[in-house]
Amino acid sequence: MVAAKTIKGMVDKAELPDNIKEELYAKLIEYNKKYKLKKAEVQAIIDETVKEYQKALIEPGEAIGTVAAQSIGEPSTQMTLNTFHYAGVAEINVTLGLPRIIEIVDARKNPSTPIMTVYLDEEHRYDREKALEVARRIEGTSLENLARETTIDILNFEFIVEIDPERLEKAGLDMERIQRKLESSFKSAEFEVDGYTVIMRPKKVGKISSLRRLAEKVKKHRLKGLSRVGKTVITKDSKTGEYIIRTEGSNFKQVLKVPGVDPTRTRTNDIREIAEVLGIEAARNAIIDEILKTMEEQGLEVDVRHIMLVADMMTLDGVIRPIGRHGIVGEKASVLARAAFEITTQHLFEAAERGAVDPLNGVVENVLIGQPVPVGTGTVKLAMNLPLRPKRE
């Protein structure tokens, strides 16, 4: 059996990154206790690890961008183009497949189906009633959500809302609270509550169109919950037995402050919101996770390193940039590369007007003018010392 100190010294000498060294050391200690390894066996394991690590490295001059584009693009052609219901929950729609991939790499400001996955703290996660309490705090509820029927009375210049008692109870509200909330928000109208009926009368009698506009505002007015968040759905995780809340709509900054929510695990599928709240590194991880998850849902396998390269390029400058003419490709230094991508004539005219010079450092511009591309063997230039002829006397 080899001493732990000896194993540590042997691992430290190996040409490996620190994180792999740590993992290798832990494994060797574990196997050493179990199988009582000899020094030669420990060295053989280290040598094999170094060999495998070197095999995994990219060759200098490899066209990694092209390989990543092919590796992500080819499986993407097999994806479906639909919006599906979320994990068997019919109430919430989620964008999957190719539209979701496009949405991520385009760095859209408003995703088509923003969703938050809200995890709960120790006190709330295993009790459905307590999970329901947290869901009520999150779920955005407006008068429209509670209404059974709405009517505009033109003769009396009134807007009448019939409230559904069941929905009212489910939302954890009462009629007095609704009246107080509306009165504090709309000073230009009077509100009367009669049983489960809310009657709104504008203080000034004007045009019917102004009553309609005011009625629309009152209907949409948020009575409780977070802004930009619609309904919530509680599901139970079959593996852990804990309750998880999924929301239609996203307000990541505010949901982290809600009592009962576990802020360390709660997440949203809105990448820009993650960057705003948690920073660019978290957004980079979210891009990788979202693309991987979308691929896996379709049963497609892509090496994570291709996706990491895309995420690195998108977040390189500390802000999220789309891949396309409004982002990375559109900001390329080469005029010819930009012209080869989209809106060719405009790029060429603008470059001619400025008297721009193309250094021809990239792949696209060299292909365009028929030169060898600076990839692989094209990245190196040979320098030779030729034998000099002796001078004639």
Swiss-Prot record:
DNA-dependent RNA polymerase (RNAP) catalyzes the transcription of DNA into RNA using the four ribonucleoside triphosphates as substrates. Forms part of the jaw domain. Keywords: Cytoplasm, DNA-binding, DNA-directed RNA polymerase, Nucleotidyltransferase, Transcription, Transferase. Part of the RNA polymerase complex. PANTHER family: DNA-DIRECTED RNA POLYMERASE, DNA-DIRECTED RNA POLYMERASE III SUBUNIT RPC1. InterPro entries: DNA-dir_RpoC_beta_prime, RNA_pol_Rpb1_5, RPO1C. One of its GO terms (biological process) is DNA-templated transcription. This is DNA-directed RNA polymerase subunit Rpo1C. It catalyses: RNA(n) + a ribonucleoside 5'-triphosphate = RNA(n+1) + diphosphate. It is found in: Cytoplasm. Its EC number is 2.7.7.6. It holds the Pfam family RNA_pol_Rpb1_5. One of its GO terms (molecular function) is DNA binding. GO terms for cellular component: cytoplasm; DNA-directed RNA polymerase complex. Its main location: cytoplasm. SUPFAM superfamilies: beta and beta-prime subunits of DNA dependent RNA-polymerase. Belongs to the RNA polymerase beta' chain family.
